[in-house]
Amino acid sequence: MSSKDQSRLPHEKGFHISWDQIHRDSRALAWRLDGQGPDEGAWRAVVAITRGGMAPAMIVARELDIRVVDTISVMSYHSGGGKADQRRDAKVLKAPDADMMGDGTGILIVDDLVDSGKTLELVRAQYPNAHFATVYAKPQGEPQVNTFITGVSQDTWIFFPWDMALQYVEPYRGTD
């Protein structure tokens, strides 16, 4: 890798996703998952990995008529103080209902993107029989996903619509 490549900022190889695109891709994910659940093709519940998985999970739950929806909050990034986000070890901040989850059988766990796979690896260790689905997947994380729609290169930075305005806008509160 050249020194120019090493100094490239994450957004220099960017993939911008609009609200319309995430909606279409999330519906495509639902279509791919339809009839694949263990209970005569049905899923018992959808669990969104917050925060990025919430919009896709909502769309998947609607399309598949899944009424039981929960979240698991996993933090694996922290703000780099104006620099590109930097990784740290993943940890669960909020877990879904334990009685509902069991070992994950019949549970559909949804996220927007699998990058390194560390977040899904942590969640999969807790719910080994759950089905993991993401809208987008990078090669390093693909082994952690059962179903995804679009593959992107490992060095691509995805700009999701909830992170964007006409230009990047810091959230009102907090950057984690």
Curated annotation (Swiss-Prot):
The keyword Transcription does not apply. Its main location: membrane. It is found in: Cell inner membrane. GO terms for biological process: GMP salvage; purine ribonucleoside salvage; XMP salvage. Pfam families: Pribosyltran. Purine salvage pathway enzyme that catalyzes the transfer of the ribosyl-5-phosphate group from 5-phospho-alpha-D-ribose 1-diphosphate (PRPP) to the N9 position of the 6-oxopurines guanine and xanthine to form the corresponding ribonucleotides GMP (guanosine 5'-monophosphate) and XMP (xanthosine 5'-monophosphate), with the release of PPi. To a lesser extent, also acts on hypoxanthine. Guanine binds at D115, I158. Pathway: Purine metabolism; GMP biosynthesis via salvage pathway; GMP from guanine: step 1/1; Purine metabolism; XMP biosynthesis via salvage pathway; XMP from xanthine: step 1/1. It is a peripheral membrane protein. This is Xanthine-guanine phosphoribosyltransferase. PANTHER family: XANTHINE PHOSPHORIBOSYLTRANSFERASE, XANTHINE-GUANINE PHOSPHORIBOSYLTRANSFERASE.
